[in-house]
Amino acid sequence: MSTAELACSYAALILADDGVEITADKIQTLLGAAKVADVEPIWTSLFAKALEGKDIKDLLTNVGSGGAAAPAAVGGAAAGAAAPAEAAAAEEKKEEEKEESDEDMGFGLFD
């Protein structure tokens, strides 16, 4: 990560910690106060657009939590024997569609 990216991400974290809306102007102002001069304006606008409408504190508290994946696995196991039969039927349909799309288009590889 470059110095500009780190500076913008730290500025965004500071703004989020203070409960201030994250905008490109506020990031640029904070970088100016910290005397970080080598940040191009595109970085501040990219970070502001990427974090617009997102709760940074919520993102930080949920980093690495895999709680959402476990219920999906349990639900899939409870489906029983019907799921493999449906999966096999879906695979057969996909194979048939692939065969139709591989038709000869009038030119060969070595023509």
Swiss-Prot record:
Region (Disordered): 84-111
Subunit structure: P1 and P2 exist as dimers at the large ribosomal subunit.
Pfam families listed in its UniProt record: Ribosomal_60s
Coiled coil regions in record: none
Record PTM text: Phosphorylated.
Function of the molecule: Plays an important role in the elongation step of protein synthesis.
Similarity annotation: Belongs to the eukaryotic ribosomal protein P1/P2 family.
GO biological process terms on file: cytoplasmic translation; translational elongation
Protein name (Swiss-Prot/TrEMBL): Large ribosomal subunit protein P1
InterPro entries: P1/P2_N_sf, Ribosomal_P1/P2
Recorded GO MF terms: protein kinase activator activity; ribonucleoprotein complex binding; structural constituent of ribosome
Taxonomic classification: Eukaryota, Fungi, Dikarya, Ascomycota, Pezizomycotina
Highest taxon above the source species: Eukaryota
GO cellular component, one term: cytosolic large ribosomal subunit
HAMAP family hit by this protein: Ribosomal_L12_arch (MF_01478)
PANTHER family: 60S ACIDIC RIBOSOMAL PROTEIN P1, LARGE RIBOSOMAL SUBUNIT PROTEIN P1
Alphabetic keyword roster: Phosphoprotein, Ribonucleoprotein, Ribosomal protein
